[in-house]
């Protein structure tokens, strides 16, 4: 299995990960790039590529070993299916939307993965979170405070993409990275 072809995309809430992943999904031309959806115990809002599971469904799948990666965040469970291992073994570049807090555990399973951190200026994050309408003002402030405290773990090389500007600008950077990995 070629874990260096696993691309773990993460960033603070409001950085635009889902928008960038949707952009990349639409614009990549390399057929060997696969975008894994997540399994989440949260209703889909239409802006994120995920499979909605009940807590019981998630727990059953976790117990059966159906997840390559799984974590909890903000009261929800998240998982990425073991199908990504077959995709990696077949030579695909596999893109997953991950969690910064779960990065150390993900690196234990896939130590050679490519880590991509999407970020945006604090005022852009705040504006996007408010527009999204999922959290109260206090919850938004707490999310922004966590964003400031996060630091790259020692020894992790990552690609940083600033998504403060246009989606097209940041999207082209992500697409170029993915297509470069697929050609290597």
UniProtKB/Swiss-Prot annotation:
The lineage of its organism: Bacteria, Pseudomonadati, Pseudomonadota, Betaproteobacteria, Burkholderiales. SMART domains: GuKc. Its EC number is 2.7.4.23. Belongs to the ribose 1,5-bisphosphokinase family. It comes from Burkholderia pseudomallei (strain K96243). It comes from the Bacteria. It is an enzyme of class 2 (transferase). This is Ribose 1,5-bisphosphate phosphokinase PhnN. Catalyzes the phosphorylation of ribose 1,5-bisphosphate to 5-phospho-D-ribosyl alpha-1-diphosphate (PRPP). Pfam families: AAA_18. Keywords: ATP-binding, Nucleotide-binding, Transferase. ATP binds at residues 11-18. GO terms for biological process: 5-phosphoribose 1-diphosphate biosynthetic process; organic phosphonate metabolic process. It catalyses: alpha-D-ribose 1,5-bisphosphate + ATP = 5-phospho-alpha-D-ribose 1-diphosphate + ADP. Pathway: Metabolic intermediate biosynthesis; 5-phospho-alpha-D-ribose 1-diphosphate biosynthesis; 5-phospho-alpha-D-ribose 1-diphosphate from D-ribose 5-phosphate (route II): step 3/3. One of its GO terms (molecular function) is ribose 1,5-bisphosphate phosphokinase activity.
